[in-house]
Amino acid sequence: MQGRSSAWLVKHELVHRSLGFDYQGIETLQIKPEDWYSIAVISYVYGYNYLRSQCAYDVAPGGLLASVYHLTRIQYGVDQPEEVCIKVFVPRSNPRIPSVFWIWKSADFQERESYDMLGISYDNHPRMKRILMPESWVGWPLRKDYIAPNFYELQDAH
C-alpha cells in the first residue's frame, strides 16, 4: 500500500522505496544517500518544516548503518499533523550522508550524536565533531562490531 508521501514522490518522479507503515500509521520511506539532500529540500518546500527527530542505528554486525529522520507537516492545524519517516542506509565502509542542517537547524546535535556513536559522517555539517565522547575516543560505541576497551583512565570518569 502506498501512502500520501510516497504517492507524491512518485508523481514528481523522485526515486524512493516505500517500507510500509509503522504501528502509528506513519509511512516509512527509504531514500538513497545521493538523493537525500534533494528530497529533503523538496520535502521542506512541500511543507515538512519540522524535523521531529533524527537518529541512527546499526542494522547488523558488518552490515549497513541507517540514519532515520522523522518529519512533520502541519497544514490543517496542530491536531492533524502529517508525518513521514525517512531512512537512509549507508555502507559502514563509507558512511556518508548529506547533512540537512541547512534545511532543519534541529539536525545539528542529532547528526553530531549519530556521528559520535556510529561514525556516520554528515557532509557539509558546520561542526561535525564528537559531542558525547572525548575527541580522543577511538571507534564508534554503538556499532554492533565495536570492541569496548577494557580499561578507562581516571580522566574519563569525570
UniProtKB/Swiss-Prot annotation:
InterPro entries: NADH_DH_suC, NADH_quin_OxRdtase_su_C/D-like, NADH_UbQ_OxRdtase_30kDa_su, NADH_UbQ_OxRdtase_CS. Its main location: plastid. Pfam families: Complex1_30kDa. It catalyses: a plastoquinone + NADH + (n+1) H(+)(in) = a plastoquinol + NAD(+) + n H(+)(out); a plastoquinone + NADPH + (n+1) H(+)(in) = a plastoquinol + NADP(+) + n H(+)(out). Keywords: Chloroplast, Membrane, NAD, NADP, Plastid, Plastoquinone, Quinone, Thylakoid, Translocase, Transport. Its EC number is 7.1.1.-. GO terms for cellular component: chloroplast thylakoid membrane. Gene3D superfamilies: NADH:ubiquinone oxidoreductase, 30kDa subunit. It is a peripheral membrane protein. The keyword Isomerase does not apply. It is found in: Plastid, Chloroplast thylakoid membrane. GO terms for molecular function: NADH dehydrogenase (ubiquinone) activity; quinone binding. It is an enzyme of class 7 (translocase). The keyword Signal does not apply. SUPFAM superfamilies: Nqo5-like (SSF143243). NDH shuttles electrons from NAD(P)H:plastoquinone, via FMN and iron-sulfur (Fe-S) centers, to quinones in the photosynthetic chain and possibly in a chloroplast respiratory chain. The immediate electron acceptor for the enzyme in this species is believed to be plastoquinone. Couples the redox reaction to proton translocation, and thus conserves the redox energy in a proton gradient. Belongs to the complex I 30 kDa subunit family. NCBIfam families: PRK12494.1. This is NAD(P)H-quinone oxidoreductase subunit J, chloroplastic. It comes from Nuphar advena (Common spatterdock). The gene is ndhJ.
